[in-house]
Amino acid sequence: MKKVLLTFGLCATVLASNAQNFSSPTWTQTQTVYKQKSDAVNSAPVTITADGDVIVSSSFNTGTLSVGGLVVRAVAKSSYIQKLNAAGTSQWAVALLGAAEVKSLTSDTDGNIYAVGVFADKVTLTTKTGTTAATLQGNSGTTKSSLFVLKYSKDGALLAYKSATSSVDATVGASEKYFYDASEAAYVRSTKAVWANNKLYFNAQYTGVSSLNGVELKGDYLDYESFMYVDIPRMSVLSVSASDLSGLTKEYTVKSDLSGMQEQAGVSSLNFAVNNGTLYVASVATGPVIVETSNKTETLNAGKDGDSFNYGFIYSEVGSTTNNKLFDGGKLATLNSNNSINDLLVDDSNVYVAGTYNTNNVFGQSVTFQGGSDSFVAAFAKGTTNVQWVVNSGVNEGDATKYAEKVTGLVVADNKLLLTGYTEETSTHTVKDGFVYNVTTSGTKTSAGSNVVLGLASDSKQVVTSGVNELNSVFNGYALSNTTGINQLTETNDVVRNGNVFSFEKAQDAVVVDLQGRVVLRASNTTNLSVDNLVKGVYVLKVGTKAVKFVK
């Protein structure tokens, strides 16, 4: 069996994968970014463009930052976005000066880059030379309660930007029944962005009242025993035009059903994926919630166990119709909830959902967790709401009242899933240990090390990781082995293309993957394969031992 060994620079531990054969990184990009270890942010998103370039981001607060030709001084805990080529050589960088944190990066087929994240107060967006490109104004104070959406060209020019800032509903604020700090209680945030269908999709959690491109985003308020108003967040998958970030469509929303509600409940976590025009969403909620799309409105409720709300794990497919299914997870098995959806991934047959849980069931499967919570991957058959399998980490991180697990990445490397995350001390969010698992597409799990990986991306040529070592951000690239033939990207005589149909000299198995390594099409024992239903983009066709890169 082949193995992947991902060695993280100065780190002593080693991370292994059942996908390829790496003994060391092919490149490493390291930058001093923090004044002290306690300043570190447990988030450093990465993505790989259609051309194979690598886009990374990190927070920084260490005086002057010099990276990729950019020289700037930190304002509060700022962030930067950097472009590297496929070999890890810096191309350019831009900064977000102020209390800003990039949560997710994605790109389109032209190499344009999109970023979503959160910020507080005032943030200056710089050019590659450090001059001001634009300014964002959010709520005053230090709480990162405002949302930004950014678009850059492949050369680092700021092409478009949007922001949203929330405030307390005027009627609620004037009622003398609202006792929260408005700068903390009213927020709009995002943690994931995906480019697809010439749209930019991103998730959003929001309370209070805000708007983006003239469309209102409004949370709910529970009038608790007619004594006080309590904020109840909504969560949505939103989309804007990828060309200029204009317009706003609520593709999918989960909100609380407030009728008769006497206790605080609602949606707490949501993630999504988009594939061939279909939106896939998974979320976690308690109490009665309403799921809204353009073609369906449905109320779902996991109910109660005695006086305690059960946790509902919700899975949805949204296309010309909407199919929702709620799985009763039961009540909490510990004092602290750690039920979350952290990533979704789609191949030609399945949708993979990654997250954490500490209930008795997760997506209908009774899987016993260890310690404060377990990480999991669940597989759903595309076109249905049927669970194929669920695997859990089985990591016992210790005292359930003090520790929990966090999932940081789920990608495909050589047709296998790579799941990364870490355990943390919940009161301070201090990282304790890392974990890495290989999961086959049939649900077999293999433990693969204990490195702390904060960000993860892959394409057909390499896996890219991010992390923090002492005061430094560390980005590593690991080339995929040539033994799979994935790097043999030339058309051969026995693989012939005619329009959107590939023909083969003899019947054999064929697989098409995108540049993120995801399987998007598969056929067995065939002499031809149509790619007519694929969206426009760059793909790799693997036939037997050969591979052909093509553009649809």
List the predicted regions and their residue ranges:
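Terminal processing/anchoring signals of secreted or surface-associated proteins
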Residues: 482-494, 512, 517, 539-541, ...
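Well-ordered beta-strand positions in beta-sheet-rich domains
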Residues: 93, 477, 528, 547-549
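C-terminal tail/sorting-segment detector
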Residues: 3, 161, 536-552
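Bacterial Sec-dependent N-terminal signal peptides
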Residues: 1-24
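Residue-level detector of functionally pivotal "anchor" positions at catalytic/ligand-binding pockets or at interdomain
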Residues: 476-508
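Glycine-centered tight-turn motifs at strand-turn-strand junctions
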Residues: 519-534
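A sequence-level/structural motif corresponding to short, flexible coil/turn segments enriched
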Residues: 20-485
